[in-house]
Amino acid sequence: MRGPSIDWGIILLKPGETMADVDHGHHEVDETFYFVEGSGVMIVNEKLHNAPQGSVFLIEPNEIHNIKNNSEDQLKVIFIKGEYKPEDKYEC
């Protein structure tokens, strides 16, 4: 669901996949990730954080991030941004 006051959705990653080809950040918007099914790695400012099922991460503005499925099972993650600002995203 995108806009106007919230942006959220479900990310499905196959084994070995990443959320994006390159890490990215947001100038103004916080983003929350909830690892619903499977396990993976949350990458924040080039640091790797294990993310087993049930993990929650709050990514603040200007924190560079990505997600990788390093398991052998599908990874399902919910993302939530409090405001829909597609122009706020930048790649690194």
Predicted feature residues:
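A short glycine-rich, His/Asp/Glu-containing loop-to-beta-strand
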Residues: 1-23, 29-30, 80
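Short acidic-glycine-tyrosine-enriched beta hairpin
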Residues: 46-61
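Conserved GNAT-family N-acetyltransferase fold
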Residues: 11, 33, 57
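Short beta-strand His + acidic residue motifs that chelate non-heme Fe in jelly-roll/DSBH
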Residues: 21, 42-43, 59, 65-71
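Double-stranded beta-helix
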Residues: 7, 66-92
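A generic "binding-loop/recognition-motif" signal
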Residues: 28, 47, 63-64, 73
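Glycine- and acidic-residue-biased ligand/ion/polar-headgroup-sensing regions
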Residues: 28-40
